[in-house]
UniProtKB/Swiss-Prot annotation:
It comes from the Eukaryota. Residues 150-258 form the CBM21 domain. Keywords: Carbohydrate metabolism, Glycogen metabolism. It comes from Danio rerio. InterPro entries: CBM21_dom, CBM21_dom_sf, Pase-1_reg-su_3B/C/D_met, PP1_3C, PP1_regulatory_subunit_3. GO terms for biological process: glycogen biosynthetic process; glycogen metabolic process; regulation of glycogen biosynthetic process. Acts as a glycogen-targeting subunit for PP1 and regulates its activity. Activates glycogen synthase, reduces glycogen phosphorylase activity and limits glycogen breakdown. Gene3D superfamilies: Carbohydrate binding type-21 domain. GO terms for cellular component: protein phosphatase type 1 complex. This is Protein phosphatase 1 regulatory subunit 3C-B. GO terms for molecular function: glycogen binding; protein phosphatase 1 binding; protein phosphatase binding. The N-terminal region is required for binding to PP1, the central region is required for binding to glycogen and the C-terminal region is required for binding to glycogen phosphorylase, glycogen synthase and phosphorylase kinase.
Length: 317
């Protein structure tokens, strides 16, 4: 196919001859609606449509509100800024902080303390009344006079060292001279003025820092729940070796436990003072130091301020 035939196909109008290839190219480029353009237009349109469909965004899954709804929400609730909040969590994801609410003290602490002291005073009065119904020692502690104690031990080879009464029992220690390897020590006690008696064995105590020529024994005696007031409660000590028996009877007077009389007058005075004190609703002025000890000579415990009220019936050590 020559150039003349191509031009006849492209433009059916008659053309002068001869025709050069340059003329064919110029006619193709300058044609108003060349056939090639119309031939290729369907492919370009299809390509453009595919590109548009390929890059079209997907529809969002979140439903958007209309402008009217947004306006209504804005009119009903004004826009407020959210406050920043910091939360701490522990290793298990639980809250790390705990909130405790404390109420302010509405009552005076000093008033509460005075009420407590008043209640303690009532309890002490009851304890004193209960103690006065029991027994008390009718003799001083033997070891309080150490020289006399040593002389009696040297003379009798056995001597009561100390004795105390705790609730419904009597406990004490006994010193004996080490004159024999085998020793048997007893406490002979009576609760009915020696109409009958009971021998209570003593227990040997190991003397870590004691002397080699003296041994120590201890005893504990349970007192009966009731003893007639006219009956005497007394005891003495016996120390037996393989061939001898030694006694300590407090120089013939025995060791007596006396009935303590109930001082009802003193208890009634204290009870009346406490009753009047509570009825008035007042508390005496008390001064407290920084360590919490009461400094008063006329407060709840005036005997704390005097050495004269300290008993001397404790062991000498």
């Amino acid at each position: 196919m020559n150039c003349t035939r191509v031009l006849q196909i492209l433009n059916p109008r008659p053309m002068p001859s001869p025709i050069m290839p340059v003329d064919v190219a110029m006619r193709i480029c300058l044609a108003h609606s060349p056939p090639l353009r119309s031939f290729l237009s369907s492919y370009e349109d299809c390509k453009s449509r595919n590109l548009v469909n390929q890059y079209k965004p997907l529809r969002s899954c979140i439903s958007s509100k209309t402008e009217d709804d947004t306006a209504n929400i804005t009119w009903k609730s004004p826009e407020t800024k959210a406050k920043k909040k910091v939360v701490f969590a522990d290793s298990k994801g639980m809250s790390l902080t705990a909130v405790h609410v404390f109420k302010e003290f509405e009552e005076d602490l000093m008033l509460d303390l005075q009420f407590e002291l008043s209640d303690l005073e009532d309890a002490i009065v009851g304890l004193k009344a209960e103690k006065e119904k029991n027994f008390s020692l009718g003799f001083p502690q033997p070891a309080a006079d150490y020289l006399d104690f040593r002389n009696r031990l040297k003379k009798n080879l056995v001597c009561l060292e100390n004795c105390i009464i705790q609730e419904r029992s009597v406990t004490g220690t006994v010193k004996v001279s080490n004159v024999s390897f085998e020793k048997v020590v007893h406490v002979r006690i009576t609760f009915d003025s020696w109409k009958s008696h009971t021998d209570i064995p003593c227990t040997y105590m190991n003397n870590v820092y004691g002397c080699e020529d003296v041994d120590t024994f201890s005893f504990s005696i349970d007192l009966p729940s009731f003893v007639a007031p006219h009956e005497q409660v007394e005891f003495c000590l016996s120390y037996k070796t393989h061939d001898m028996t030694y006694w300590d009877n407090n120089d013939g007077k025995n060791y007596k436990l006396v009935h303590t009389e109930n001082d009802s007058s003193q208890a009634s005075v204290i009870q009346n003072a406490t009753t009047d004190f509570k009825a008035q609703g007042k508390r005496p002025d008390m001064e407290f130091d920084q360590f919490g000890s009461p400094r008063t000579s006329s407060g709840f415990f005036p005997e704390w301020q005097s050495w004269g009220h300290i008993e001397n019936n404790t062991p000498y050590w």
